[in-house]
């Protein structure tokens, strides 16, 4: 990636074979990806005053640095007990970590004369999370099944368990602002307007800025899914066939969000 200036790593492994005179089959698979990347973009909002003059009312510059790590592991087995009975098992586990740092400089509430408020914001996390905002998603799915034949009666069944979680620990936003700033607006390129600070104004964070807000959020989502099904079929003496079965499903989902906003007792010491 040309912004992160780091290479992407991709690894994969697959192995399969049969054992015990082909009665037991096995397939194993694993993959790993580490992708550091980033982006830079500018966003603008245009307005028109009563005199028909068009001007930029909101001016944003955003830079993102993200490291995405993906891990996936899976296994599948089938076992032929004998010609009338067979068991199968499948399992998969996925883990995705996103570490993100975002830096945003925003000129808000610009008027047609180029006067507005500068906001500088960072989105990050704690030292335990590489000082970045961590989003961790995990999924797992396991299924056990079988096929059986007892004379004229056949049966197949399947039991499965799936779980998905998402964690966003210590997601922090730090926002500073500086009011009454003046800018010279070059609108010759409508797709890329250029704001140049006037005399005494700035886009660079300094001790002139005041704290706008400091917030922290914890978010946890968990979803579980359990299923069991069984199907039977029987051949009757008159040549007819009887089929019946049952299925049970249980699903749960929980979401918990804790939000905190902090105000320093001594803002001068905090700055």
PLM feature spans:
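Membrane-embedded beta-strand positions of outer-membrane beta-barrel proteins
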Residues: 1, 26-30, 89-91, 157-159, ...
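Outer-membrane beta-barrel and related beta-rich outer-membrane complex signature
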Residues: 38-46, 87-114, 125, 156-158, ...
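Transmembrane beta-strands of outer-membrane beta-barrel pores
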Residues: 1, 32-36, 93-97, 150, ...
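Extracytoplasmic loops and strand-loop junctions of Gram-negative outer membrane beta-barrel proteins
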Residues: 55-61, 122-130, 209-217, 269
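Outer-envelope beta-barrel architecture signal
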Residues: 22-26, 83-87, 151-157, 238-242
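Transmembrane beta-barrel wall of Gram-negative outer-membrane proteins
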Residues: 3-109, 127, 137-144
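Flexible glycine-rich, low-complexity coil/linker segments exposed to the extracellular/periplasmic environment
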Residues: 183-213, 264-271
